[in-house]
């Protein structure tokens, strides 16, 4: 079962790869519209993190951002666990991608803009609460 799971998540499934080839060959406006939509989502999410005072590299070509949460004083694991339990928002600890990921979280913007905005509000509330705890 583990091997099956590993092969399923290692790369895009063959059917998805063939679908991508077909989309490229028969390119139409929907691809450009989708690219613009994801660009807008990325910009909204990045601005949200910057407004919270979280440094965030401006990634291109992915569906994820990797903001720094070092200013909260929490480890990546603690931040993610508390955010999940306290605000019901799931993000991935940076340590899932190696030691250098400590102090960061990975956030997907492959959601609707409304869901992204809701999540950003909850993350902002959590970050403010954690910073206030540090100052008490």
Where are these regions (language model features)?
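PLP-dependent class I/II
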Residues: 1-136
């Amino acid at each position: 079962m583990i091997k099956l799971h590993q092969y399923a998540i290692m790369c895009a499934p063959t059917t998805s790869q063939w679908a991508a080839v077909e989309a490229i060959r028969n390119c139409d406006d929907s691809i450009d519209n989708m690219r613009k939509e994801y660009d807008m989502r990325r910009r909204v999410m990045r601005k949200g993190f910057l407004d919270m005072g979280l440094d965030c590299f401006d990634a291109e070509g992915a569906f994820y951002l990797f903001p720094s949460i070092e200013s909260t004083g929490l480890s990546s694991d603690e931040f993610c666990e508390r955010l999940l339990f306290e605000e019901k928002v799931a993000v991935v600890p940076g340590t899932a991608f190696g030691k250098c990921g400590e102090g960061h979280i990975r956030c997907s913007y492959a959601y609707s803009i409304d869901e992204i905005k809701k999540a950003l509000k909850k993350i902002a509330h959590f970050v403010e609460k954690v910073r206030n705890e540090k100052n008490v």
